[in-house]
């Protein structure tokens, strides 16, 4: 495959969620796998609902996921192209004016359904004469414009679904322009795909029906050789099978980030859920690129469980090496000669990254005294080995205490953990003790704030 060009085309009318992240990542990984180009295109022709704040948040969310566009476009800056395309379609007799109101169209659909017929537009507007149209416009009606579909079956070899086809006879001529002259999704999308030389359109299976219309639009505007390859993936749904929407606030990418989920875990879940590859932690997007294969996606619904994401995020965190998180640690003043050993000591006990701040306080800051069995702690303090300490200091120290007291298991270790860390559980003390150091250990075993 030579230099594919793909795009992710969100509407900036809200914040993107985990379901939107799926096509964004699939397109990005596809471009990186085959050394192609990934375009971010904002479908913002709806000037009333599109907001700059949403566009900005989408860019932030994509960057957090590791998605870096090669180009960014905005449809609101490209209206001249769409007007030109509409004129081409009019000149070819493929774009025609219609004057029915929404209520009139709804009545037509209901009559068709009552007769057991599919609710397809009857093309009544094609029978209007110039005088008829002039009269309707004199009454104050303004036309919306439909694309006249040619009869026949649209066929394509779908990257994911295989051989696919839709009979144009089963579809209504789609509306491309509203009464106010604004554009619906279909025309600008095709015009931009042609202009940007998009080679592959990878999107959700809810767009399968659109494909038949768009194939005809590609052919009408650019000829048979300019139709891209299509791939329609299964959609992410909730664990109960419901779809996601921009109103699903708790699963917006921004919300998942704020909850402390790892971006790599969100990416892995978005890409691997509903595929033949088990969802698993990854260390980088490059790992997802290396294993990327659209053929692994299932035809069945991809059910996403937020509870599983929490577990995946923690497992992802546990395997991240120090170099990967060095800058994130430094942002919280976790630096210096202890930082690497600290990360390797605590990462396996973290649920979210910010938990490491509390453990850094245990190592470098002060904690309130928590003492049980003060006589035993006094003995432990008096038997602390001399520094320097390494990972063997803990076993040497506790071995000596075991020999002197006969204690073992929880009776031996629990009072020491409480005194040294203030916690019931946590990282291996063999790794933490050298980081805490003898001075703090002595003070904490004595019941002092240290």
From Swiss-Prot:
A motif ('HIGH' region) lies at residues 10-20. GO terms for biological process: glutamyl-tRNA aminoacylation. GO terms for cellular component: cytoplasm. SUPFAM superfamilies: An anticodon-binding domain of class I aminoacyl-tRNA synthetases, Nucleotidylyl transferase. A motif ('KMSKS' region) lies at residues 243-247. It is found in: Cytoplasm. Transmembrane segments: none annotated. It catalyses: tRNA(Glu) + L-glutamate + ATP = L-glutamyl-tRNA(Glu) + AMP + diphosphate. It holds the Pfam family Anticodon_2. Catalyzes the attachment of glutamate to tRNA(Glu) in a two-step reaction: glutamate is first activated by ATP to form Glu-AMP and then transferred to the acceptor end of tRNA(Glu). Belongs to the class-I aminoacyl-tRNA synthetase family. Glutamate--tRNA ligase type 1 subfamily. This is Glutamate--tRNA ligase 2. It comes from Beijerinckia indica subsp. indica (strain ATCC 9039 / DSM 1715 / NCIMB 8712).
